[in-house]
Design a protein with these regions (language model features):
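Conserved ATP-dependent adenylate/AMP-binding module captured primarily in the ANL superfamily
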Residues: 84, 128-159, 242-259, 289-303, ...
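Conserved ATP-binding/catalytic segment of the ANL
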Residues: 438-505, 522
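Conserved pre-ATP/AMP-binding loop-to-beta segment of ANL
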Residues: 52-55, 170-171, 192-221, 228, ...
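Conserved AMP-binding/adenylation subdomain of ANL enzymes
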Residues: 18, 240-257, 264-370, 381
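Conserved AMP-binding A3 loop
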Residues: 69-72, 217-243
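Structural core segment of the AMP-binding/adenylate-forming
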Residues: 44, 88-89, 116-194, 576-582
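Conserved AMP-binding/adenylate-forming core of the ANL superfamily
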Residues: 57-112, 129-134, 187-196, 234-237
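Conserved structural elements of the adenylate-forming
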Residues: 76-81, 213, 232-253, 261, ...
Length: 636
């Protein structure tokens, strides 16, 4: 059956206002994806048959300094050992198993090993609080919990008394000090001995045959910006559909070396990692997120998925070096960036061939200046860099493309098993500011209220133990309501903001805070920012400065300070930051521009409840914590 697309556009005039709803769907169905009995339980073993002793995983031990590796055959053997050990512990099909750890190879073995016995894995963020893990363990009735390092073990151990179903804690890191009075905890190495020599492999293989695509693979609890915790159910059918769709849209190959640094508890990294495994790529497992740039320089990945904040840091770092360079060097680099922008964005992104003279000039800069920048990042030989999770500033997106890195901007949710849409860099024209074209086999509808709604094989069937919220999350046509406002133009999806985050000023103007925040986060002096505007006369902001740079600026300009509070209250500092804000917000409408701001001495944190585990702002909590500072900005 041929593959084809259908756009259905509905429009009518209502009191002089044009209203439209757009739908996109790729109608082709792949029989292998829809009907096969193979699911994630056998993925690694199939790849081992294909790739054998080729390198599959590159990693460091917990606290280790040296990079090590596993071949595909070794990877497969470890997964089988986990499956056998789980059977010896008494794990049943579709039983829920928790994984509370930072990224590690043990984490990957545990995921695939659990799927091998048709169990369900529930990833917890390594930064989760005791209250959060207690809720998830009790909600999902978890008996067995894998944990990473000392922090995770200590939290799990203290939670035991409040979790009646929890029987066993399995500790990945051998350096963790297990409480001598804790009979429930064992090290991962001890656990693996339960599956040594694969004593129950016949039963494991029988479970492979019984597996079906309706089996749950994961339950991912999303705390969200409101604080409500919901377990998103993801099946093997969703994963198979997602792998097929992303295979068509995102071209990672067996030649790629892929850095994993976002948490495996994040659906973006989890989905991306499984795609890379399914394509035969080599994974580089980064355990400590703070070490990612060091890891990149040591291992030279060709691809990785990232959130916009990563590229914002790269952008501000390069801009700082440009600002500190000589006049001649500064002029040269800015000209090179202008050439890169013209070549890669004005021509290539629009599907046009650059003029020969421009191409030759770009090639010169690409092999000199831009290659030096990429080398500093450890990105000498590169493929693609999927980026999602928040709004990407146009400045940052243009910069990344200009220096010769293929940023693939996309959009997705946990409920859609990551990708809904993404750029097709090098294949189809893409627009800076869009989140790309819808992926294969997903239907997008823009509701009358402007909400992005989804239907397709990658969409969750609902929330674990929450039929009430599940029912509220789908419309009468069976479309999942994302909560994001957006529109489709020329086949590309554009997002505005979270519907619940859209502010309406007291003058009746609508403000999209994430868009404004993304514009300002490119400034090197701004580390965090929250826009305030709802039912207010004008837009204001709470800003956490990048204090290391701000302190350097103060010393260079003779500004006396004893601590951060002095910097926050200094008039010269305020004047400097306001001037930088005014430069960045020139293209915003007058009513969108920040009129006042307050500098805060301490960052927004997960521990304070101001950030989610994915580092998104909990605006309600921040508004409550800084009510006094906010009211002061609006005082006459």
């Amino acid at each position: 059956m041929p593959r084809f697309k259908i756009f259905i556009i509905f429009a009518k005039t209502d009191a002089g206002r044009k209203r439209s709803a757009r739908r996109w769907r790729d109608c082709h169905k792949n029989k292998n994806i829809m009907q096969t009995k193979n699911h994630l339980s056998v993925l690694v073993h199939n790849q081992a048959k294909k790739y054998g002793d080729r390198e599959a995983l590159i990693y460091k031990d917990f606290g280790g300094k040296t990079w090590k590796s596993y071949s595909w055959n070794q990877f497969s053997q470890k997964v089988k050992t986990v499956s056998n050990a789980l059977l010896n512990l008494g794990v049943k099909p579709q039983e829920n198993i928790g994984v509370f750890s930072q990224n590690s190879v043990q984490y990957i073995f545990s995921d695939f090993g659990a799927w091998g016995v048709r169990a369900v894995t529930i990833p917890f963020y390594a930064t989760s609080s005791e209250q959060q893990i207690q809720f998830m363990i009790n909600d999902a009735k978890v008996r067995f919990l894998f944990v990473g390092e000392q922090e995770q073990y200590d939290k799990a151990h203290r939670t035991l008394a409040h979790c009646p179903t929890l029987e066993r804690i399995i500790v990945f890191d051998n350096s963790v000090k297990i409480d001598p009075n804790d009979p429930n905890a064992i090290y991962f190495d001890e656990f693996m001995k339960l599956g040594e020599n694969l004593p129950r492999q016949t039963e494991v293989e029988s479970l492979y045959k019984q597996a079906n695509l309706d089996d749950l693979a994961n339950i991912l609890y999303t705390s969200g910006t409101t604080g409500d915790s919901k377990g998103v159910m993801l099946s093997h059918l969703q994963y198979k559909a997602a792998l097929e769709a992303n295979h068509r849209a995102v071209h990672v190959t067996e030649k790629d070396r892929v850095m994993n640094f976002l948490p495996y508890a994040h659906i973006f990294e989890k989905g991306w990692t499984l795609l890379c495994i399914s394509e035969g790529a080599t994974l580089i497992v980064n355990t400590d997120p703070k070490e990612v740039q060091k890891s990149m320089r040591e291992t030279h990945p060709t691809s990785m998925c990232a959130v916009p904040r990563f590229w914002e840091k790269v952008y501000t770092g390069v801009q700082e070096k440009i600002d500190n360079a000589s006049t001649v060097q500064r002029k040269l680099f800015r000209h090179a960036l202008a050439v890169g922008r013209k070549h890669n964005i004005e021509y290539l992104s629009r599907g046009k061939r650059p003029p020969l003279a421009l191409h030759l000039e770009y090639e010169m800069y690409d092999k000199t200046l831009f290659s030096l920048v990429r080398k500093q990042l450890g990105l000498e030989k590169t493929n693609i860099f999927p980026t999602a999770g928040a709004t990407v500033s146009a400045h940052v997106e243009e910069f990344v493309h200009s220096i010769g890195l293929k940023m693939v901007v996309g959009y997705g949710l946990t409920e859609s098993l990551a990708t809904v849409s993404c750029d097709r860099v090098g294949e189809q024209p893409y627009t800076i500011g869009s989140v790309g074209r819808p992926i294969y086999n997903i239907e997008i509808k823009i509701s009358d209220e402007g909400e992005v709604c989804l239907k397709g094989d990658t969409i969750t069937k609902g929330y674990y133990n929450r039929p009430d919220i599940t029912a509220e999350s789908f419309d009468e046509e069976g479309f999942f309501k994302t909560g994001d406002s957006g529109y489709i133009k020329d086949g590309e999806l554009f997002l505005k903001d979270r519907i619940k985050d859209l502010f309406k000023t007291s003058n009746g103007k609508y403000i999209a805070p994430q868009m404004i925040e993304a514009k300002l986060l490119v400034d090197k002096f701004i580390d965090q920012i929250v826009i305030i505007a709802d039912q207010r006369k004008f837009v204001s902001a709470l800003i956490i400065p990048e204090y290391k740079l701000l302190e350097e600026y103060a010393r260079e300009h003779g500004i006396q300070f004893a601590g951060r509070e002095d910097l926050c209250g200094n008039a010269l500092i305020h004047k400097m930051i306001m001037e930088r804000i005014e430069t960045l917000q020139q293209q915003l409408a007058h009513y969108e521009q920040i009129k006042r701001f307050t500098l805060l001495p301490n960052p927004f944190t997960m521990e304070s409840g101001e950030l989610t585990n994915t580092l998104k702002m909990r605006r309600k909590v921040i508004n409550e914590h800084y009510k006094k500072e906010i009211e002061a900005m609006y005082a006459e």
